[in-house]
């Protein structure tokens, strides 16, 4: 069976790097990279498609390419990378919702990876210094990027309930500006 991976956010460093590495993997037949602007860096081996994940047209990209794995890297930690807080929220939350809707309708998607963040744990003075995956923050994030990723995770959990046939992964890396 052919393996076709769609990676969002390929114009930024981490998304582009991942797409390039996946394209070099012999178990992956094709990598489709999606973003609103063409990458300034090399993504050789990746088929670039200019598309906005906030638009329902992303479903056409997934279906026409026969994508079986979606890796959503287009979650922006810093408002300046998005043009301000409002566009950041739209890209992060609305974009993820549209992408999940497209994956839900898809007949080919079998795996979904959505980049989350350790920011979802919060960082109040009452929180412990170290968290485990099983722990919950004392207070849910109330604003900014941390709230975005908490909302995103909630939508992804809902997707996983509706599509139990799709394997879902939510990695929570520690954020660094260089990884946007």
Segments predicted by a language model, with ranges:
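SDR active-site strand-loop-helix element
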Residues: 8, 34, 70-76, 112-118, ...
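Glycine/proline-rich active-site loop of Rossmann-fold NAD(P)-dependent oxidoreductases
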Residues: 164, 178-180
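Active-site Tyr-X1-5-Lys
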Residues: 141-171
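N-terminal Rossmann NAD(P)H-binding glycine-rich loop of SDR-like oxidoreductase domains
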Residues: 2-27
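Conserved glycine-rich Rossmann-like NAD(P)H-binding loop of the short-chain dehydrogenase/reductase
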Residues: 27-36
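Conserved Rossmann-fold NAD(P)-dependent oxidoreductase catalytic core, especially the SDR/UDP-sugar
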Residues: 97-145, 169
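NAD(P)H-binding glycine-rich loop region in Rossmannoid oxidoreductase-like domains
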Residues: 53-94, 105, 123
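Rossmann-fold cofactor-recognition segment
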Residues: 43-55
